[in-house]
Amino acid sequence: MGTKLGVPNLWEILNKKKIKATFFFTVGPDNMGRHFWRLIKPKFLFKMFRINPFKIYGLNILRSGFIGKGKNIGKICKNEIKSASKDHEIGLHAWDHFSWQTWINMFSKKKIIKHINLGKNALQHIIKYPVTCFASPGWRTNEYVLRTLKNNFNFSYNSDCRGSNLFFPYLGDGKIGSLQIPVTLPTFDEVINIKTTIKKYNSFIIKLIKTQLNFSVYTIHAEIEGMKYKKEFEEFLNIAINEGINFCRLKDLIPKEIENIPIYKINHKTIPGRDGWIAYQQKIIK
């Protein structure tokens, strides 16, 4: 399990480099094994051949929740989550990651609220302080979800989509949603053996960071960079630090004055290397 095994490794690496980061945790059932049913989709099947999931994740992670209900991540990984919370910003990723990523477009308002409440309450019970940020599983959200989150939860920001800069999402009725801090860089599994190789991956990401003017938001996964490729991740940090790249928590990107942060739409699109759609930042609303 990524949280159980990968988070302590990431925590150790980041602390050794004196880097503060933001961790988003899934704290409900581990149903990753249910993604096996997506093998009937050609794009997902190709991705599995491309990244070799058995080598990266291991059989125990891949079979979690394949049949029956997966183990409760928050309960069996509470010590790992609590340790990370002592030095880093903690946010909610999901109660049930698989369910949200697969069916969020069919979720009712009641179900959205239930998922967030279950996750938020479980995470707060572990870390013993309020959860103030949220990141949608698989970068999947929509206007209905954003409105529900804005009206029912007091998150200081969300990180629900891909994009280039801080913005407020337009909700279509003259209102805006909670502040968004979008992810600006691709993930390991999206580009390996498509745009780069494992040996060249760190250089590939560093070059992208240098082309992004304001800031870069880089997503890593405990089950990848915290396990199989933890050595490569530490090498990435060494290169970045030597290149003068600074790291911070996501909340540190929020300016004191937020009145001039622009308003954008959130739309859906597909991207190379990822099965299905993601939410992304689209054209400014005047």
UniProtKB/Swiss-Prot annotation:
Q: Which residues form the signal peptide?
A: none
Keyword list (alphabetical) reads:
Antibiotic resistance, Hydrolase, Lipid A biosynthesis, Lipid biosynthesis, Lipid metabolism, Lipopolysaccharide biosynthesis
Looking up Pfam families in the UniProt record yields: Polysacc_deac_1
Annotated catalysed reactions: 4-deoxy-4-formamido-alpha-L-arabinopyranosyl di-trans,octa-cis-undecaprenyl phosphate + H2O = 4-amino-4-deoxy-alpha-L-arabinopyranosyl di-trans,octa-cis-undecaprenyl phosphate + formate
Biological or metabolic pathway of the protein: Glycolipid biosynthesis; 4-amino-4-deoxy-alpha-L-arabinose undecaprenyl phosphate biosynthesis; 4-amino-4-deoxy-alpha-L-arabinose undecaprenyl phosphate from UDP-4-deoxy-4-formamido-beta-L-arabinose and undecaprenyl phosphate: step 2/2; Bacterial outer membrane biogenesis; lipopolysaccharide biosynthesis
Check the record and name the PROSITE patterns matching this protein: NODB
User: Which residue intervals define the domain NodB homology in the entry?
Assistant: 1-248
Q: Which GO terms describe its cellular component?
A: membrane
Q: Which GO terms describe its biological process?
A: 4-amino-4-deoxy-alpha-L-arabinopyranosyl undecaprenyl phosphate biosynthetic process; lipid A biosynthetic process; lipopolysaccharide biosynthetic process; response to antibiotic
What GO MF terms are annotated? hydrolase activity, acting on carbon-nitrogen (but not peptide) bonds, in linear amides
What is this enzyme's EC?
A: 3.5.1.n3
Family of this protein: Belongs to the polysaccharide deacetylase family. ArnD deformylase subfamily.
Q: Which HAMAP family match?
A: ArnD
Report the protein's function. Answer: Catalyzes the deformylation of 4-deoxy-4-formamido-L-arabinose-phosphoundecaprenol to 4-amino-4-deoxy-L-arabinose-phosphoundecaprenol. The modified arabinose is attached to lipid A and is required for resistance to polymyxin and cationic antimicrobial peptides.
Recorded protein name is Probable 4-deoxy-4-formamido-L-arabinose-phosphoundecaprenol deformylase ArnD
To which species is this protein native?
Wigglesworthia glossinidia brevipalpis
Gene (UniProt): arnD
